[in-house]
Amino acid sequence: MRSRSVVLAVIAFIAIVAAAVFATLYFTKDSGNESAAPCGDRIFGHISSLKQTDGGYEMRFDPAWFTSGVTANVAAAEDGVVEPCEPVPNDNYRIEEGHRLLTYLVDPDAQVTVLTRQGDPANFGSTPITVSELAQLVDGEKPVELFEPLDTGVWIRVNVDTVCALDQQYQP
C-alpha cells in the first residue's frame, strides 16, 4: 500500500512539473511578430498651425465633431440649423463646440492626402503629399493646387500624441 502511495505521489509530481513547464513555454513564447505602433484614433478637426521642430513637426489642432445620421439630424435641429425631423444636407453636420487648440506631434513620414483635381477620382481627388508640403499649405503657400481649401477639415489618426496619418475631408 505504501509503495502505491509513493508511485501516485511521483506521478502527481511529474504531472505538476510538466504542466508548469508547458505553461511557461506557452505563455512566454515570443511570436516573432514585432509590429509598429498602432495608428488608430481618428479625430476630425481643423489645423491651426503646423511647424517644423527638431524631430519632426508640431501641429496645433482644433477638434470638431463630424456627425451623421440621427446624431447629425437631432444636433442640427437642436442648434436651429434644420427644422425638427428634417435631415441635414449631405447627411453630415459638423459641431464646433469650442476652439480649444490641442498640440500633436506629427511624424515627418506620416501619410498625408489632400484633395486635388489631379488626384484619384475614385477617392474624390485624394492626392498623397509630404508633411512638409502640408505645412506649406497651412502657411498659405501652394506646393499643390487644392480642389477645396483645408478649412473643409481633416481627419487625423493618432497614436497617443503623435499623428501618423492625415486626410483632408471632402465637402460637397
Task: Report residues per predicted region.
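N-terminal export and membrane-targeting signals
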Residues: 1-13
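C-terminal region of N-terminal signal peptides and the immediate post-cleavage residues
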Residues: 20-38
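Generic hydrophobic/packing signal
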Residues: 16, 25, 107-109
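Solvent-exposed hydroxyl-ligand-binding patches built from regularly spaced Ser/Thr
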Residues: 32-172
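Low-complexity, intrinsically disordered/propeptide-like segments
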Residues: 11, 25-30, 137-140
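Core hydrophobic alpha-helical transmembrane segments of single-pass membrane proteins
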Residues: 11-21
